Amino acid sequence: MFPTGWRPKLSESIAASRMLWQPMAAVAVVQIGLLWFSPPVWGQDMVSPPPPIADEPLTVNTGIYLIECYSLDDKAETFKVNAFLSLSWKDRRLAFDPVRSGVRVKTYEPEAIWIPEIRFVNVENARDADVVDISVSPDGTVQYLERFSARVLSPLDFRRYPFDSQTLHIYLIVRSVDTRNIVLAVDLEKVGKNDDVFLTGWDIESFTAVVKPANFALEDRLESKLDYQLRISRQYFSYIPNIILPMLFILFISWTAFWSTSYEANVTLVVSTLIAHIAFNILVETNLPKTPYMTYTGAIIFMIYLFYFVAVIEVTVQHYLKVESQPARAASITRASRIAFPVVFLLANIILAFLFFGF
């Protein structure tokens, strides 16, 4: 039934398999035991934060150096930034003797040591970061440098548009179980910007950092927070000849009706200039920021509409008085309108400037 000599060959194969697998099983048991009882090799996600020195919190000094800032979107209230992020802190576990080591500075990979978990609060999605350098001094001071790019969300205030100034914020926090463990500080020597940093249509005034004294709760954990502020002001000169002056010229043309005696001509003039103003306003509206509050430009546009409304009433009253055989009274109202409209318009603009700019 079976080939001759089959049973002895099967027995020999089983014996050979036992001789092969028994040593391998023993090695596996030893390796599992070493992994179970040996201390872990700490990496960035495994090393616990260094303990406070002399019952003081661990201070992480931060700095952001702007390389470029671009694509400021008024409607989305976002901007893009390309910059360096520098961190420094002391970890005594990394201290070494430069004489014995033969080096004055040691370099590490990000996975080899503990690194504070710095997060950008108002960044859309996650920042794109490339670690440039991680170096450690003999006393354990760690210098961390990365280059990053991000799209940042920052609320804008358009109340004074187009004469507005804005503060663009970049918020940093550090994750910590207890605020006594890790706090953020500003390294002023590492805060700055390139001289050629610019934003189209804006003047960059300053770039500073502010430490927020009050921590806030996030996911039942307290955070330490920094606020990097980029102060900018809008280049408003182009808005004057392109938006403001055309609206004023159209309005002033309608006032020539106060020097005409023809009712039909006056009505045609006022209504046609009103239509021109509406058409121009629709064209300008596409470039104006959409806000739930009144802006300075919006207030001027609304005020101009009011003057058109009053001008139509004046022309109608003037014609009514003439029909009712009161030409003298109609003429006096017309003469008064020639002075009253410009004066009231000037006073209204002064009031608006005071309300929006606090002069």
Curated annotation (Swiss-Prot):
SUBUNIT field: Homopentamer.
Organism: Gloeobacter violaceus (strain ATCC 29082 / PCC 7421)
Consequence the record notes for mutating T297A: Marked gain of function, with a ten-fold shift of the proton dose-response curve towards lower concentrations. Also shows slower apparent rate constants for activation and deactivation
Name the record gives this protein: Proton-gated ion channel
Further remark: The homologous nature of GLIC to eukaryotic nicotinic acetylcholine receptors and other eukaryotic pentameric ligand-gated ion channels, and its sensitivity to general anesthetics, define GLIC as a structural and functional model of signal transduction in the nervous system, also relevant for exploring the molecular basis of anesthetic action.
UniProt cross-references to InterPro entries, sorted A to Z: GABAA/Glycine_rcpt (IPR006028), Neur_chan_lig-bd (IPR006202), Neur_chan_lig-bd_sf (IPR036734), Neur_channel (IPR006201), Neuro-gated_channel_TM_sf (IPR036719), Neuro_actylchol_rec (IPR038050)
Residue ranges of the TM segments: 236-258, 262-286, 295-323, 327-359
Phenotypic consequence of S272A: Increases the binding affinity of TBA
GO molecular function: extracellular ligand-gated monoatomic ion channel activity; identical protein binding; potassium channel activity; sodium channel activity; transmembrane signaling receptor activity
UniProt membrane topology term: Multi-pass membrane protein
Localisation per UniProt entry: Cell inner membrane
